Amino acid sequence: MTTIQPAPMAFFTNRPTTEIARDLLGTHLLYTSHQGTLGGLIVETEAYMGAQDTAAHAYNGRRTPFSEPLYHEPGTIYIYQLRSFFLFDIVTQAVDQPQGVLIRAIEPTHGLAQMQRNRPNKPSVNLTNGPGKLMGALGIHDKQLTFKNVATAPLTIDLANRRQPRHITTAPRIGVNAKAASGQLPYRYFITGNPYVSGTLKKDWDREQHGWL
């Protein structure tokens, strides 16, 4: 692998958050810690559109200590807890425009053995095929990286070694209120046929190329 190129703040602004969510597919999510560098190719994302999005933490301009990171500069890390899981959201758009992208799944490429130790007895795709699962595999179990920026943090997006998807599927987001105004909007993006996408059926997997060109 060539030198890592962390995504700059400019990557996360000056275009729609939906476009950013699509563009993150095929980039590497990497985390460097005492365990080494762990991570993989991003294969599934969800866009959250801020104050007008009924599924967003900042819906109606809600601003609390919990959601404060969303109001910071583009590329800010927003880690939050959902039950026993920690989830990773990247802030998009300019300061005080609280939009973001949730990283839902990755295909492991770095430190697979260590990720398997971090999530023992989770074979094959179950290791990282969900937003909480991938964070556990990376060994992230707290919010300490929140407010840091992926441009300089040990948790980063590598733009230099990306892969191109053959096809991207759009769909409604998972786990949101489907009856709310934004509930059925197609703000979820994933690599068609990739086995690590959450909730996919084995019959739909591309077992040879995993959906990559």
Swiss-Prot record:
Q: Which UniProt keywords are present, listed alphabetically?
A: DNA damage, DNA repair, Hydrolase
**Any one Gene Ontology biological process term?**
base-excision repair
Signal sequence bounds: none
Enzyme type, top EC level: hydrolase
> Which E.C. number(s) belong to this protein?
3.2.2.-
Query: Which source organism does the UniProt entry give?
Result: Latilactobacillus sakei subsp. sakei (strain 23K) (Lactobacillus sakei subsp. sakei)
**Top-rank taxon:** Bacteria
Can you say what this protein is called? Putative 3-methyladenine DNA glycosylase
Question: Which molecular function GO terms apply here?
Answer: alkylbase DNA N-glycosylase activity; DNA binding
Q: Which SUPFAM superfamilies match?
A: FMT C-terminal domain-like
Q: Name one Pfam family in it.
A: Pur_DNA_glyco
**In which family does this protein belong, per the annotation?**
Belongs to the DNA glycosylase MPG family.
